[in-house]
Curated annotation (Swiss-Prot):
Coiled coil ranges: none
Natural source organism: Homo sapiens (Human)
Protein name, as recorded: T cell receptor alpha variable 34
Single GO cellular component term: T cell receptor complex
Subcellular location: Cell membrane
Name of encoding gene: TRAV34
Signal peptide positions on this chain: 1-21
Disulphide-bridged cysteine pairs: 43-109
């Protein structure tokens, strides 16, 4: 029997005093993935990104910081999770390779 992972997506907006009404859109908004499959989550900003943060929240637990991206073209990886920042498109993508049950949870992006 194949395991099905549920990944919920959310937006976590950080506001600095000099940034007003930063809007982030994450897509897809929800996702169900079979174990072993790859998945990609995108986070797009309405304004210039100076820093983008990815978090994960397991059911019933607090936020877990995954990574921070600050430079355009920057790419970081940790435990089958890779994130990349594209400043020109004002977006970041989070890619999970060969998903496992430990990847289930809510993924959030935040920006400043």
């Amino acid at each position: 029997m194949e395991t099905v992972l549920q990944v919920l997506l959310g937006i976590l907006g950080f506001q600095a005093a000099w940034v007003s009404s930063q809007e982030l859109e994450q897509s897809p908004q929800s996702l169900i993935v079979q174990e072993g499959k790859n998945l990609t989550i995108n986070c797009t900003s309405s304004k210039t990104l100076y820093g983008l943060y990815w978090y994960k929240q397991k059911y019933g637990e607090g936020l877990i910081f995954l990574m921070m991206l600050q430079k355009g073209g920057e790419e970081k990886s940790h435990e089958k999770i890779t994130a990349k920042l594209d400043e020109k498109k004002q977006q970041s993508s989070l890619h999970i390779t060969a998903s496992q049950p430990s990847h289930a949870g809510i993924y959030l992006c935040g920006a400043d």
